[in-house]
């Protein structure tokens, strides 16, 4: 399960950006063509955040659909796999979205001093 290593990296990046502040929420964008399983990330998140500033944080995942642009006609089509056929019959597609993995938002607890 490569999601465990991916989740460890996400926790490390968020921890670095939080600079010691308690993290309340993390929003990820995961492309549907990325071969990353959101449910596995959720499972690993609970394990990887134990004893960190992310412990107890809410994890939200926004799944980004696959979208391709035809090199022949310029048309755009939604993809559920990294290849497809355009309405014009061409298989020459460039992926626009669907392979991403982004930490989109981090919400931290504000400390009043």
Swiss-Prot record:
GO terms for biological process: protein maturation; protein modification process. Zn(2+) binds at residues 70, 73, 86, 88. GO terms for molecular function: nickel cation binding; zinc ion binding. PANTHER family: HYDROGENASE MATURATION FACTOR HYPA. HAMAP family: HypA_HybF (MF_00213). Belongs to the HypA/HybF family. This is Hydrogenase maturation factor HypA. It comes from Nostoc punctiforme (strain ATCC 29133 / PCC 73102). The lineage of its organism: Bacteria, Bacillati, Cyanobacteriota, Cyanophyceae, Nostocales. The gene is hypA.
């Amino acid at each position: 399960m490569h999601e465990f290593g991916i989740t460890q990296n996400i926790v490390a990046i968020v921890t670095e950006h939080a600079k010691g502040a308690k993290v309340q929420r993390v929003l990820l964008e995961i492309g549907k063509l990325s071969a990353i399983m959101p449910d596995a990330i959720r499972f690993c998140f609970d394990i990887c955040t134990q004893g960190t500033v992310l412990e107890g944080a809410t994890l939200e995942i926004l799944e980004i659909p696959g979208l391709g642009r035809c090199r022949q006609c310029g048309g755009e089509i939604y993809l559920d796999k990294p290849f497809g056929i355009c309405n014009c019959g061409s298989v020459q597609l460039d992926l626009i979205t669907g392979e991403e993995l982004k930490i989109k938002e981090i919400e931290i607890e504000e400390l009043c001093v």
